[in-house]
Amino acid sequence: MPTPVAAARQCLSPAAVPALDAAVASSRRRAHAQTTSLHLISSLLAPPAPPLLRDALARARSAAYSPRVQLKALDLCFAVSLDRLPSVSASSSSSGAADEPPVSNSLMAAIKRSQANQRRNPDTFHFYHQAATAQTPAAVKVELSHLVLAILDDPVVSRVFAEAGFRSGDIKLAILRPAPPMPLLGRLPTRTRPPPLFLCSFAAADDADVPSPAGNLAGAGEENCRRIAEILSRGRNPMLVGVGAASAADDFAAASPYRIIHVDPNTIDRSDLGVAAAMASATSGLIISIGDLKQLVPDEDAEAQEKGRRVVAEVTRVLETHSKVGRVWVMGWSATYETYLAFLSKFPLVDKDWDLQLLPITAVHAAATAGPAAAAAGLMPPATTVAAFSKPAASLMDSFVPFGGFLCDNYEENSLTANSCPQALRCQQCNDKYEQEVATIISASGITAEDHHQGGLPSLLQNGSMMGPNNGFDPVKARDDRMVLNSKILNLRKKWNEYCLRLHQDHQRINRDPYKPFPRYIGVPTDKERSANSSKGSESVGVQKDVIKPCAVSAVHSSSTARPISSPSVTNKRNEDLVLNLQARHSKSDENLQERGMQSQHGTLSNVDNPDDHVSPSSAAPVETDLVLGTPRECSSKGSSSTCSKRVEDSERSVHLVPKKVDDLNLKHPQLSVQPNSCSWSSINVGKTSHSTLHSVASGGFSAFGQWQKRSPLAAQNSDLSNYKLLVERLFKVVGRQEEALSAICESIVRCRSTESRRGPNRNDIWLCFHGSDSMAKKRIAVALAELMHGSKDNLIYLDLNLQDWDDSSFRGKTGIDCIVEQLSKKRQSVLFLDNIDRADCLVQDSLSDAIKSGRFQDMRGKVVDINDSIVVLSRSMIQGSKNGLEEGLSFSEEKILATRGHRLKILVEPGRAITSGCPSGKVVVSPRHFLTKIQASLCSGSISKRKLSISDDQEKLQESPSSSKRLHRTSSVPFDLNLPVDEDEPLDADDDSSSHENSYGNTEKSIDALLHSVDGSINFKPFDFDKLADDMLQEFSNILRKNLGSECMLEIDVGAMEQILAAAWKSEEDRKPVPTWLEQVFARSLDELKLKRKHVSSSTLRLVACEDTVPAVKGDGLGVLLPPRIILDC
């Protein structure tokens, strides 16, 4: 039923009421029975109406037609549509001439939809508080823009627009994103104006190749990257929409200095967003790419919809946690506007929670044909350092006009200098003097530091009202002053370049410009940095430039004086003051070095912690620092040797960890000393990047634990701490235990990778020694290090140096060192794990000692192999500082578990009897925790007949003395030399206590101790608690026994069978737990079979024993060779 006009008028805002009145007048004039949406749109197209719809049509028209022709066609289409509407009769018209035509149901439905949209959007709805009476028709007044958006959804109106060549989606987007003010747009030069927003391509299909009017526009990809970077600089998250959105995202990822992590519904469960976001504060930043929005809004697949919700929930959690303390953004794209609206309708809170900003992408450059396909497949390239924004000098000069273009002054002058003088290299001394003169010119020009900082910001971010005629801002004068200033700076740079090239030809030169891969506006400062930088004045211009620009990663020769660009990792006032303080101190140190003729680059520097010797003469010059974390063993003076040794002891001390998340680990980052001007890694290693699964914490493609240039002491410490925590978390996920050992290992690795090696600047190898038992944990750590540090598990080289294990045919005719050299020649970058180092022969030990000193191995034939980028792990079963290698107080030893082989198991059924609490050997394991189920395990230690089927009830006594089981198994590492005569004076009954053997063994121990004292880190491993594992296994047996046979049945497990089960559980991987599977599938099935064969088995005593014959290996059963696929039943 039509609605009266008065009732509809009460639902509209004062700005929308005149439009409805004009529509009603048009309907009355045409003698129509109702006022429809066509009347309202037709009235808005008339000149007296507000220009909202006309401006949107001007920007949303098709480029295939002339604007005048298309708009005239639209007027004609609406006139024809109105003429087709039915008219009332003449008598009805004359009788009701004074009555207003009521509002049609379609128009009233559009008004109601507008009210609902405004009510759901708290940012745009307005309440007109009227008298709180029941007759109040509505509390939300519909604005004109929302009314037009709702009417455009009417199929009748959309069909009329389509006949004229318009699309409702394009008109909606034009209304939501109004054009910038005309005076601002008119002041832009022709070359820097953005392309017109012809959004007809937004409704194209995702995979359609629709030609764009800006498709051949030069620099379209560059323009899109600048627009994306502008949104990031505002602290908002871009959402790209249009046919060119995929290629724009691909181009930005290729040229961005940020780390980009792609997240989609299929990889959200395996992604480490929390870890990467935690590291973002110590790097240039992190962008989470959710890819195509179409993946998050599937049509009917319930599972895919659930995955999409998990993606949105995880990204929201990361943004809420790390957006305020780190540099974390989110970015996505969609080829159609309808997909974007469907995404917002499915997740209505995302627009506000993520702080999204819609960015239309209508320009697709021809060189990016492969970009959208790659982006659509979810392949976002990693962050690289590509100079993607090089523009001709003419267009760059045009961008100096105020409010025009997004390039800042600093980037333009760098580009101009690079074009005019390609060999713009200066030594350190000339560069400092040049920067001092630049700071003087800037301070004398009257342009404050705030204005200079705003010169590199987009025009809409600069302070002040740019459009006000009486606000005191003269754009022409600002443009002229800025052009004059930049001209002076260019002349200064050219002068100092020529001066340095002419007079300082033998000096080390620096070139900081090529290390700026991205315009400086991409270094997004935090709010605290902006406020701090804007209030410092003109003398802090140089410091500001260093704080906001991104980090450029490079590796240079140790003798070079190139100073890296500082990282924008300062996120609070306290850390910022620390960085500025260290930079000021180092500035004075650099000045003193320059006055001495740059001769102290390789000498001993003064202590950086002395405040009296490091007072910055002027903070006007830009200062940077290349302070890196020094080696704890390297001290600047003899007086600090005791302090350094104490730091070494502290750094090698293990820290207790709680095995949860990395943020919950009670970690202590390495105790590293900070030394100024430390030598960086050698230039010969540049490009030798390891293919690590860990992404770099800084852009440049380097491994997270490879070589990088230090930015500042604070940034270096933050980076090392992040790497340390990340490495601990990854190793703990693989190993699952030995928290203290993992902490010490990661501390040693980060310390060695972060500082110059104590063996020389060109040495990148790391030597570790693992002391103690738990050999499975050691091997898992070695495998994890090979995968994390060198990209694959295949980069692990494992060799057991025990003399008794060299009977294999593959080792025949080879010595231990020959095998090491052969394997290292195949895998240059690897983890070399040498087990049982204390049982190796003297030749291997001597070769290892030489390799630690020289960094290379040499076999018996003279072949030499380098170990420069490898990690060498030496392992021994004896704990450091202990003379006994046995685990005291444990019922099961690792030596016995390792010697266990897979035997068949058998269940013996005996009549019910009470299990005594002891056996003749006195070794009984009865856990009070499992006594509730009346299950006990009688573990008779060392029985000779424990693997035989004929086991007596009284359990045979031990045949060997307890002392023999506790005797440490030692194999003499001194080989026999047949060329030496036999010592006749040696007694025939010589044993281990003879003096000759003690001397040889003592010499071997000294050689091993000297070798192990030369490693970078010694780590003690705790013995594995097999008793606790046995208790867990007993509990599993108890649960299955109670479930299948009841609580009255008793089970007695032979020690041989128990050792076999413990070995299977210990040697299995963490993600594969074969023992619970075996219990459920094999043991439980055997109990069911036994229950069918024996009637009163529930009141009997069962014994699980091991047989003599071994279990044949069966492929694909998943149980391993230690667990038989079936258990023999003795009924």
Curated annotation (Swiss-Prot):
Motif EAR 2, chain ranges: 799-803
Span of the annotated motif EAR 3: 976-981
Residues annotated as domain Clp R: 8-181
Record-linked InterPro entries: Clp_N_dom_sf (IPR036628), Clp_R_dom (IPR004176), P-loop_NTPase (IPR027417), SL_signaling_regulator (IPR051650)
Post-translational events: Polyubiquitinated. Strigolactone, but not karrikin, triggers rapid SCF(D3)-dependent degradation via the proteasome.
Organ and tissue specificity: Expressed in the shoot bases of seedlings, young leaves, axillary buds and young panicles. Expressed in young roots vasculature, culms, internodes and nodes, preferentially in the parenchyma cells surrounding the xylem.
Biased composition range(s): Basic and acidic residues: 646-655
PROSITE patterns registered for this protein in UniProt: CLP_R (PS51903)
Keywords annotated in UniProt: Nucleus, Repeat, Ubl conjugation
Keyword Ubl conjugation tagged: yes
Compositional bias segments (type: Acidic residues): 982-993
Cellular component terms per the entry's GO annotation: nucleus
GO BP term (any one): response to strigolactone
Biased composition (Polar residues): 597-609
Subcellular location field: Nucleus
Protein induction: Up-regulated by strigolactone treatment.
PANTHER family: CHAPERONE PROTEIN CLPD, CHLOROPLASTIC (PTHR43572), PROTEIN SMAX1-LIKE 6 (PTHR43572:SF38)
Quaternary context: Interacts with D3. Interacts with D14. The interaction with D14 is enhanced in the presence of strigolactones. The interaction with D14 occurs in the presence of (2'R) stereoisomers of strigolactones, but not (2'S) stereoisomers. Interacts with the TOPLESS-related proteins TPR1, TPR2 and TPR3. Interacts with SPL14/IPA1.
Domain free text: Contains 3 EAR motifs associated with active repression of several target genes. The D1 domain (195-440) is essential for the strigolactone-dependent D53-D14 interaction.
UniProt-recorded name of the protein: Protein DWARF 53
Gene responsible for this protein: D53
